[in-house]
Amino acid sequence: MHINQMQPMLAEQLDDYLSRIRRIFVELGIPEDLPTARGLELCREPTELVVGETRPQGREFYLTAAAATAWHALKLAAAEEGIALLMVSAFRSADYQADIIRRKLGKGQTIDEILRVLAPPGYSEHHSGRAIDIGSDECPELGEQFENTRAFHWLANNAQRFEFCLSFPRDNPFGYVYEPWHWCYRGD
């Protein structure tokens, strides 16, 4: 099992986290070997988060302090070029990830279908507090059509300067669908 080293976690906390993830896998019918087979890394939840952004409706999105600082700089640089970037999603816990899967299973989707578009609990970059789903007022949220927006083209050309990268390009090795909206902070 690969472990994402982005966030410190005490050995006891890591053991508890792994036990929780294993229980969720069993409950949801996720094959135990799926992370290894797909080359996924365990993403630990940070011990500290800050409000990275608050939407006009009052919804708060949480990130690590470093990711929030980088996001603000990235968003400001884009705005200076007339590009509006919208935060659609940021931190979510492994338990919340499991709830999303439960809802999809309840709607009749199979676990295989779900895991093509959603990481198994414990393995989503969103757990790290460093991943952001980015949208634009140019198109509906979380759709492949985001790649045709000015926002996406700006990100493709500039995000790396702020230590963000596109996590799931076309034909990515992790078995996920193409997610032009999903960007992860890779800085310290």
Q: For each predicted feature, which ranges?
A:
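Extracytoplasmic cell-surface/polysaccharide-interacting catalytic and binding patches
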Residues: 1-90, 95-188
